[in-house]
């Protein structure tokens, strides 16, 4: 008998059906990956096994250890959740309660599902955190979620999920919010803990590289329908369904032209420091200094892409903000030969030369502004001489350049708001906003990490085409080695605020001299 068996599961919200007659099974100790893009129904399917989907109508059968989950009473469901089946959510910062210490949140689960209380429950919680590799465990257990790094928060959530030794662990995109090296550590940790406890794992993901390495079987979902399932090697190496084939073939393809001569960005001995609060009574009277970037030098040529890689906290995003003139820095940074140490008026003119595309377009685009207002905002600042007709013409051309519309068909889009577009379309709007002022340099801060794999490929192809068309230079900040391979001419590796090594793409990714770089590359292809 299977540990979990789902038969003809359908889920609907009112008249809208989001999962349609899905069937699969999972044996004790087995690893099954549910794969699909956003809105494929994979998360709804997995969370339905615990009846965690509110205001939904569920039909079909869900059996756990032979018991009908859809017929369980509330007290039976309470025992099932956390004790027999546990969940790790995608973003630990939103899943953990910000007003309670991490250890207290783990204690709550232990006291709910076991007979341990007080000091015994606390000791068990600290032990669970120690087992998942959190160092300085007693202090971390008394810390609040915001005081931990992303990797530590995810480990704390894993500790909470595994504290009561569940038979099944549901991991919903458990590493999407983490950088490559931490992602590999967390996945290897999950695999070790799963093997030790003989636990089954239901992995929800859109990352086929992850599936290749960690799943025994894979089930592919598209628009609420399970289109294909089977052993991992069979499904990925010989996909039968067109949708599975599209997912497998969505890996970015390298398509870059040669860079030009000269320099559009020059950085010399760049140093960025933050004030930090000192511990104890000293913190009342003085502050310390934290160095986020130390002694960084680099150049960027016209039409060139420089990939900056490194773990969270390595200083790569801080360096990008300094280059953008958004953070005070020591040393020398020149954009097109001009320094940021100029008057406010000259600084405004310089900002036209360098623009940025952020990681998550939903949070970087104002929900109160229309597409026309979002894209045209830069023109109001940098080209105030344009009349309304000319400004709209430039906006329409920008939409056409990023592939959101055919010529002459932009009018219906201009009055719409960001929430009315898909994730990929929103990122195209963000790119159009950056390009509307005709910059020489664009900083790309994790430009595809919030997108599905097929949309990632489309956006990367768009960026490559725009680079060839306009001679753009890119500073690409990312932890995705596949994206670096597809876009970068040169790579710079950062660790603990410093450059570990830099050079041509092949030199760094294939013939690296640094153990740290090799670890990043290995994690990126995991």
Task: Give names to the regions the model predicted.
Residues 163-167, 436-440:
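A short, proline-enriched helix->beta-strand linker immediately N-terminal to the Walker B motif
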Residues 211-213, 484-486:
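A short, surface-exposed alpha-helical micro-motif characterized by mixed small hydrophobic
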Residues 143-148, 152, 412, 417-421, ...:
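Conserved ABC ATPase signature
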Residues 120-139, 390-412, 522:
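Conserved ABC ATPase "signature" region
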Residues 61-79, 117, 188, 279, ...:
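ABC ATPase NBD Q-loop/coupling interface
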């Amino acid at each position: 008998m299977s540990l979990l068996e789902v038969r003809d599961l359908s889920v609907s919200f009112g008249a809208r059906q989001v999962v349609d007659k899905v069937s699969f099974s999972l044996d004790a100790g087995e690893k099954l990956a549910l794969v699909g893009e956003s809105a494929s129904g994979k998360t709804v399917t997995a969370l339905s096994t615990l009846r965690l989907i509110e205001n939904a109508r569920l039909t079909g059968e869900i059996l756990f250890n032979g018991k009908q989950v859809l017929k369980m009473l509330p007290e039976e469901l309470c025992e099932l959740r956390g004790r027999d089946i546990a969940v790790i959510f995608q973003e630990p910062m939103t899943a953990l309660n910000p007003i309670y210490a991490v250890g207290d949140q783990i204690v709550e689960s232990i006291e709910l599902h076991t007979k341990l209380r007080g000091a015994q429950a606390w000791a068990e919680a600290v032990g669970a955190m120690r087992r998942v590799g959190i160092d300085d465990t007693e202090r971390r257990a008394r810390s609040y979620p915001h005081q931990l790094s992303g990797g530590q928060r995810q480990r704390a959530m894993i500790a909470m999920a595994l504290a009561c030794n569940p038979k099944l662990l549901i991991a919903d995109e458990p590493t999407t919010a983490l950088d490559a090296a931490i992602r590999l550590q967390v996945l290897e940790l999950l695999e070790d803990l799963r093997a030790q406890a003989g636990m089954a794992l239901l992995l929800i993901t859109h990352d086929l590289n992850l599936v290749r390495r960690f799943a025994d079987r894979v089930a592919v979902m598209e628009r609420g329908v399970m289109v294909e399932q089977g052993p991992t090697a069979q499904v990925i190496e010989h996909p039968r369904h067109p949708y599975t084939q599209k997912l497998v073939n969505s890996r970015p393809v390298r398509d870059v032209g040669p860079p030009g001569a000269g320099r559009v960005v020059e950085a010399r001995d760049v140093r960025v420091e933050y004030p930090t609060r000192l511990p104890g009574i000293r913190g009342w009277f003085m502050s310390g200094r934290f160095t986020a970037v130390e002694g960084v030098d680099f150049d960027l040529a016209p039409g060139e892409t420089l990939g900056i890689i490194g773990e969270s906290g390595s200083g790569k995003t801080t360096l990008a903000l300094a280059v953008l003139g958004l953070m005070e820095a020591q040393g020398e940074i020149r954009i097109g030969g001009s320094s940021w140490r100029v008057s406010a008026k000259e600084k405004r003119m310089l900002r036209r030369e360098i623009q940025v595309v952020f990681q998550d377009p939903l949070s970087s685009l104002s929900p109160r502004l229309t597409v026309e207002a979002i894209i045209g905002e830069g023109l109001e600042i940098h080209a105030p001489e344009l009349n309304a007709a000319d400004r709209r013409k430039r906006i329409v051309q920008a939409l056409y350049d990023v592939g959101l519309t055919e010529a002459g068909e932009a009018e219906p889009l201009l009055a719409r708001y960001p929430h009315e577009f898909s994730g990929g379309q929103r990122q195209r709007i963000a790119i159009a906003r950056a390009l509307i002022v005709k910059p020489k340099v664009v900083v790309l801060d994790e430009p595809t990490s919030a997108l599905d794999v097929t949309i990632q490929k489309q956006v990367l192809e768009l960026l490559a085409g725009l680079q060839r068309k306009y001679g753009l230079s890119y500073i690409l900040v990312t932890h995705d080695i596949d994206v670096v391979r597809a876009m970068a001419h040169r790579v710079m590796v950062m660790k603990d605020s410093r450059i570990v090594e830099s050079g041509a793409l092949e030199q760094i990714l294939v013939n690296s001299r640094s153990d740290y770089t090799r670890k990043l590359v290995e994690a990126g292809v995991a």
